[in-house]
Each structure stands twice: as C-alpha cells, then as structure tokens.
C-alpha cells in the first residue's frame, strides 16, 4: 500500500498511520498471532476471507482486514479523500456567507426610507425642522443607494459598514455649520482668532464635531444614540482627567439644551450631551502647547460671555461682572506655590542617623525616618539625647548596654546610673546599724579562705611566720575599725 492511508481499528482506539512505501500485514505493528492467516473483507462483501501467504492483495479505501476472525479488525481510510471533503465543506460555507452578505445591504437600503420619514412626523411642532429633516432623509437614501452600487464582489469579502456609521462620517465633513444662538464657527488652525465676546473660532485636528441647532441633532440622534451611549462613560473619564475649564462645557451644554428642548425635549438630551463631551475631548487633544494656550483663552472668554448672556436673559436686574474669572493656569500656579510652603511647615524633623556618613543602608524608608550629613535637619535630634519628658522605658543595662541595634536605642532610654559616693556609704547617716557583733555567722562570712600549696609536713621559716602574723594583725585591725563605724 502507498502512503497517505490510515487504519481505523473497529474495536475502538486511535488510528494507525501507515508509512510511505510497501506495508506487509503480519509484520511490525501488524504482526499476526500464532501464525494464523490474515483475513480480508471488501466493502461489498460481508464475509472475512483468509489471505494466502506471499500473495499480494489490493486494499481500497473502505476495505477491512483483520488479524483474527473476530478481533483486530482494521478499516482502510484515505487521507486525501478526507481533505477533499473538508475543502468542499469550506467552499459551501463561503458561498453561504457571500449570499448572506449580498442580502444585508438590500435590506438596509430598503429599511432606511421607511425609518427616516418618522423623524419629521415627530418634529412637526417646529417649522424650521422640516426642511432640515427632509435634507437628511435624502442624504441617507442617497448614501444607501451608493452603498448598494459599490458592493464588492463576493470573492473579495470586504467588510461592509452599517449605514449609521457612514451617515456619521458624512455629517462630520460639514465644516461650515453655524449655530444660531451662540454664533460659534469652526475654522482651520491658521484662522483661529478670538474676534468678539460672542464669536469664537476653535480649531480641532482631524475630524470636527459641530453643534447645530434644531432638528439636525434630533434626526442624527436615531443613528448615533446606540454608539454614543456606550462611549459616554469612557468620554467622561477622559474629559475629567484633562485640564479643561468647566464653565465652557457648562455653557455649551446649557445653551444647546435650551435650543433642543423646544423641538424635541425627550429624545435630544443624550446626543446633545454626547456631542458636547466629544467636542470638549477634541478641543483638549490639540497639537502644540501654544495652540493649547490660545484655545483655552478663547474658551475662557467664551464662557464669560455665555455666563453674562444667560444671567441677563432670566434676570435683567443682575449687574454684569466687572472682570473675567481668573484663568485655570493662574489658579493652578497659585495652588502649586502654596503647596511647598505648607509642606515645609508640616515637615517633621527627622532623627539623625547614628552612622552618619558611614551609613550603608539603601532602604528609602530609612532615609524618610533618619537624616544624614547634607540634610537640613541633620544633627537636630540625636538618638542618645535624654530629656526629662522622655516617655520611653528605661533599658535595664543603662549606658553599659551592649546592644548595637539602632531600633533598640530608639525604643529604650539608656541613662547613666548615679555613682555612689563615699559619703553615701557611711552608715552614720540615717538609721543606726542593728547588727549583733557577737554573731558567729557574720564572722564566718567575713573570713576569707585562702588556698595554699603547703603540705602537712612543711614547716615555714621564721620570716614567713612573721609576715603571716603581721597580715593577721592588719586584718583584725580593719575588722575592728569597721565595727566601730
């Protein structure tokens, strides 16, 4: 048999791969048992036929052979046929996917004209919203038709974006929209100049998100609500981490909400807030630091004018503020200047390290608690200083403590014990002694035993005897003098 074939045991078990070349049944892993003949069973016949020795027999995929009559039965399988089956299955699945992709844009283009007329029905309360909604509907239908024409071939298998994502991209390309209430125009970076209090030019890199009045926001809210609601939390966290004056965002959101509540109060809150947050995020991410400073100055002047206009509308009696609020950069600089002063006042004086310049420790915690040569507070507090108001316990060894651990010296006081003078040892001061001079026990304690190397037969000379007598007399005299005291 040639390579590319496997044997499947009918009794169960893993397949046996055949080596390329000729394979002899009854040798190697297919060794016969007790010299019994091997049996052959074709796919058409149902009986096992014994094979004759030294005679070739062709085995086709699907045939069976066994080493015993009822055991060790193997089925011949072709790996090439299995690969062809897998390829055919994959091709059929690819064709099914292509058919599904062809049906998707047709249904989307058919649904768009039915959904879009619902926007002008809900916005009949305002007359200005009707032409804008009709224009948006026409643009949606035109884009869907372009999509159906520009569909790629099934063989290319390119990803097709849904209609609401494409409409969002088209709305981003309108760069000259001007809102009626705020007079905010979006221009290129070269033309960014703060003109008047009520007119601000703000530049954004790349795509630019515009806030328009009336129904243009409410109509685009249908397609954009799903995506913007998901990204609301992420945008809030990004905006909060940036340094952007909050008055600008509050003024923009408040003004846009006033314009939108007239047309569609229930459905335009989410897109307006999302648009405001996206515009803030894009304003923050500017190219250079100079552009950041100019954009922030523009936003501050705009916020001051907006606050004036909003205060004048509901309450005309309020006077206008005399000066603009201070810039966040100035406030931040003041805060940073005041922080080091407070930190210097609250700084605790560290303890001087006992090793000084020879300290070998590298632990930063050690440097936080101990000062070293070169520090401003080095030498101010010593570990060995003993104050009267020191609450630490006294070390039992005092100044003669042998421990070298700095932590031990911090936790315990090591004061020197007062040395007793000769006058303190005098017994005349205080109460008199009540010793019994005739007590034999006291005399026995005071007598000292002096070991000698003298033998019992040794007799001392006269000079030695005189020295011993003198020493004994001196001891007795000292004892007598002590007793008198």
From Swiss-Prot:
Bias kind Polar residues: ranges: 212-223, 237-249, 286-309
Annotated segments matching region Flexible linker: 380-390
EC numbers, comma separated: 3.1.1.-
GO molecular function: 3'-5' exonuclease activity; ADP-D-ribose modification-dependent protein binding; DNA endonuclease activity; DNA-(apurinic or apyrimidinic site) endonuclease activity; histone binding; histone chaperone activity; nucleotide binding; poly-ADP-D-ribose binding
Skewed-composition ranges (Acidic residues): 441-469
Domain FHA-like per the UniProt entry, residue ranges: 1-84
Residue span of region Disordered: 103-156, 206-348, 420-470
Positions of short motif NAP1L motif: 449-473
Zn finger region (PBZ-type): 351-372, 393-414
Domain notes: The PBZ-type zinc fingers (also named CYR) mediate non-covalent poly-ADP-ribose-binding. Specifically recognizes branched poly-ADP-ribose chains generated by PARP2. Poly-ADP-ribose-binding is dependent on the presence of zinc and promotes its recruitment to DNA damage sites. The KBM (Ku-binding motif) mediates interaction with XRCC5/Ku80 and XRCC6/Ku70 and recruitment to DNA damage sites.
Family as reported in the entry's similarity comment: Belongs to the APLF family.
Name this polypeptide is given: Aprataxin and PNK-like factor
Natural source organism: Bos taurus
């Amino acid at each position: 048999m040639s390579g590319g074939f496997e044997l499947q045991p009918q009794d169960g078990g893993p397949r046996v791969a055949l080596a390329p070349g000729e394979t002899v049944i009854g040798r190697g892993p297919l060794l016969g048992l007790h010299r019994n003949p091997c049996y052959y069973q074709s796919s058409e016949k149902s009986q096992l036929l014994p094979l004759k020795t030294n005679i070739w027999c062709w085995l086709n995929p699907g045939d069976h052979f066994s080493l015993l009559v009822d055991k060790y039965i193997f089925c011949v399988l072709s790996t090439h046929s299995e690969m062809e089956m897998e390829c055919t299955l994959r091709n059929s699945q690819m064709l099914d996917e292509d058919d599904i992709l062809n049906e998707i844009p047709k249904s989307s283009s058919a649904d768009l004209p039915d959904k879009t007329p619902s926007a002008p029905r809900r916005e009949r309360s305002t007359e200005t919203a009707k032409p804008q909604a009709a224009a948006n509907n026409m643009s949606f239908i035109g884009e869907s038709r372009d999509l159906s024409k520009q569909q790629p071939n099934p063989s290319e298998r390119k990803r097709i974006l849904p209609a609401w994502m494409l409409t969002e991209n088209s709305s981003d390309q309108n760069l000259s929209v001007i809102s009626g209430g705020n007079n905010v125009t979006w221009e290129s970076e070269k033309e960014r100049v703060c003109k008047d209090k009520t007119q601000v030019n703000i530049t954004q890199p790349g795509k630019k998100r515009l806030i328009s009045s009336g129904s243009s926001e409410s109509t685009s809210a249908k397609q954009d609500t799903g995506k913007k609601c998901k990204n609301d939390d992420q945008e809030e966290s990004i905006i909060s981490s940036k340094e952007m004056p909050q008055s600008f965002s509050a003024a923009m959101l408040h003004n846009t909400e006033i314009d939108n509540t007239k047309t569609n109060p229930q459905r335009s809150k989410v897109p307006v807030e999302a648009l405001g947050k996206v515009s803030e995020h894009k304003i923050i991410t500017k190219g250079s630091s100079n552009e950041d400073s100019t954009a922030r100055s523009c936003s501050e002047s705009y916020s001051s004018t907006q606050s004036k206009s909003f205060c004048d509308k509901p309450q005309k009696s309020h006077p206008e503020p005399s000066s603009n609020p201070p810039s966040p950069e100035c406030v931040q600089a003041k805060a940073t200047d005041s922080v080091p002063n407070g930190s210097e006042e609250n700084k605790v004086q560290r303890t001087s390290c006992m090793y000084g310049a020879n300290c070998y420790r590298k632990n930063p915690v050690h440097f936080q608690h101990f000062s070293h040569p070169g520090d401003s507070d080095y030498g101010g507090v010593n570990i060995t200083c003993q104050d009267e108001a020191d609450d630490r316990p006294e070390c039992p060894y005092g100044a003669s403590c042998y421990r070298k651990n700095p932590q031990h010296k911090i936790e315990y006081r090591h004061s020197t014990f007062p040395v007793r003078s000769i006058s303190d040892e005098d017994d005349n001061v205080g109460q008199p002694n009540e010793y019994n001079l005739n007590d034999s026990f006291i005399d026995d304690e005071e007598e000292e035993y002096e070991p000698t190397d003298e033998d019992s037969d040794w007799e001392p000379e006269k000079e030695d005897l005189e020295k011993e007598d003198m020493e004994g007399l001196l001891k007795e005299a000292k004892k007598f003098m002590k007793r008198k005291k």
